[in-house]
């Protein structure tokens, strides 16, 4: 087992990893930017090293500085969290070259699964159902239009290297195709330095269902059930829950088996997520694989009793999975709401600033993952998510009631958040019915 782990991240996920290290008796090393000198993760870690200025390029995205900090602190492994360098194949490779363990899959797997077209082809070869679409890269709108007409409108235009909802546009007809293609491609170039696009059939009003998997270095892979992430705004998840109201035991088992097959086809190790679209006829299609821990991993932890961060550490240290598929039982229901420092009334504009007063909820079955405190100033340089409120109940309605109560207890002064917006989602009759799709926000809130 590792003696010392460096956490190449910030915010609530850095705090989450530090806590797991502490429970395992592993020394934790935080890295931080000048904007984060008072951040909670720097205070909780055993050691903290400043790696640069506030801009992510000068700190949390600066591979050389992070690796220098790891070498200087004699850390044996780096946990990348999510975002930043977590799905950067070059960084994983650099860790390997420096004889530091990257807590995640290999650089080659990150590269292959990060390229959406290669990931699709890998799944097609493994007989995993995929959304009908192009098999080759598309670089021009003219060529893309020809392929779109063959597939049939509406289509989804996607960046091959995309993620987080960037580089994606829906085209409903040949008339709007060129404009949407060019916008998506520009986003891809700006966000990922890659102009490679691909086109697939747009599945209307699907559910977004993802399966959590764990895989060790010895070919053992298990599924930890699904998360329903259908409540999204512009492809950004807002509310996540497990299990999904849409799946019965038979479909859950079938999708879980396909998720395991997909992970094996990718030669995957560590915690990972296979994302599917589920259409109105209960047909499911592979969408992408996330080669990192997810923001929404706590809902899976609540219904399985596993600690996914610890499992990642065990796997990276070369240990065999201590669980078999028959050991995994989904009990009860968990829901997560993301609390963001943003103003829904002003097109969700980020609202950084000082927290003058903070009270977060508690009680039986309520978990808070956050890095904020009274007096803390949220810097303007990073993602607007400041906390995750997670609840657990014996069934979905109990969990909804608990979330309604928890959100009602939150008191945060000094900054604007999406708290009321999340409350409105949770109490909406359509959400309560469980009959939700990825169009929920668009249909009822915009």
Walk through the language-model features, giving the residues of each:
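ATP-binding N-terminal substructure of ATP-dependent carboxylate-amine bond-forming enzymes
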Residues: 1-125, 138-146
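ATP-dependent carboxylate activation and anion-phosphoryl transfer catalytic cores
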Residues: 7-16, 20-23, 48, 71-73, ...
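Structural detector of well-ordered beta-strand residues that form the stable sheet scaffold
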Residues: 29, 79, 101-103, 131, ...
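Structural signal for short hydrophobic segments within the conserved structured cores
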Residues: 47-49, 111, 129-137, 168-169, ...
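Methionine-biased hydrophobic packing positions in alpha-helices, especially
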Residues: 110-113, 123, 156, 168, ...
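A polyampholytic, Gly/Pro-enriched intrinsically disordered region
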Residues: 122-131, 152-154
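Acidic/histidine-enriched active-site and ligand-binding environments that engage anionic O-linkages
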Residues: 146-156
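N-terminal nucleotide-binding beta1-loop-alpha1 segment
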Residues: 159
């Amino acid at each position: 087992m590792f003696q010392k782990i460096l956490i190449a991240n910030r915010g609530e996920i850095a705090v989450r990893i530090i806590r797991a290290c502490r429970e395992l008796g592993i020394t934790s090393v935080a890295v931080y930017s000048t904007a984060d000198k008072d951040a909670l993760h720097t205070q909780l870690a055993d050691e903290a090293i400043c790696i640069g200025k506030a801009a992510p390029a000068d700190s949390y995205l600066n591979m050389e500085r992070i690796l220098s900090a790891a070498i200087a602190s004699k850390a044996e492994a780096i946990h990348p969290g999510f975002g930043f360098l977590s799905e950067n194949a070059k960084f994983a490779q650099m860790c390997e070259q420096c004889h530091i363990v990257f807590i995640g899959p290999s650089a080659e797997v990150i590269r292959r699964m990060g390229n959406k077209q290669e990931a699709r082809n890998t799944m097609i070869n493994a007989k995993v159902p995929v959304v009908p679409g192009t098999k080759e890269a598309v670089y021009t709108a003219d060529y893309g239009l020809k392929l779109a007409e063959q597939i049939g409108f509406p289509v989804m235009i996607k960046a091959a290297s995309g993620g987080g909802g960037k580089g994606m546009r829906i085209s409903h007809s040949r008339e709007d195709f060129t404009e949407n293609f060019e916008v998506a491609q520009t986003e891809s170039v700006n966000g990922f330095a890659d102009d490679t696009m691909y086109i697939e059939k747009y599945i209307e009003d699907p559910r977004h269902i993802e399966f959590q998997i764990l895989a060790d270095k010895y070919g053992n892979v298990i599924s930890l059930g699904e998360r329903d992430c259908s409540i999204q705004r512009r492809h950004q998840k807002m509310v996540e829950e497990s299990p999904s109201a849409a799946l019965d035991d038979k479909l859950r088992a079938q999708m879980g088996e396909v998720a395991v097959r997909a992970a094996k086809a990718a030669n995957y190790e560590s915690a990972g997520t296979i994302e599917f679209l589920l259409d109105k006829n209960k047909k499911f299609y592979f969408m992408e694989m996330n080669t990192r821990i997810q923001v929404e991993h706590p809902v899976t932890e609540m219904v399985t009793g596993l600690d996914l961060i610890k499992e990642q550490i065990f796997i990276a240290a070369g240990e065999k999975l201590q669980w078999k598929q028959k050991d995994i039982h989904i009990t009860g229901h968990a829901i997560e709401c993301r609390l963001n420092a943003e103003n829904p009334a002003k097109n969700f504009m980020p609202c950084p600033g000082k927290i003058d007063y903070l009270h977060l909820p508690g009680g039986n079955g309520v978990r808070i993952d956050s890095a904020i405190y009274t007096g803390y100033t949220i810097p303007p340089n990073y993602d607007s998510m400041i906390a995750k409120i997670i609840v657990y109940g014996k069934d979905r309605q109990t969990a909804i009631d608990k979330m309604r109560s928890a959100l009602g207890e939150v008191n945060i002064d000094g900054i604007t958040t999406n708290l009321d917006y999340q409350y409105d989602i949770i109490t909406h009759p359509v959400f309560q019915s469980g009959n939700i799709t990825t169009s929920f926000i668009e249909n009822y809130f915009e």
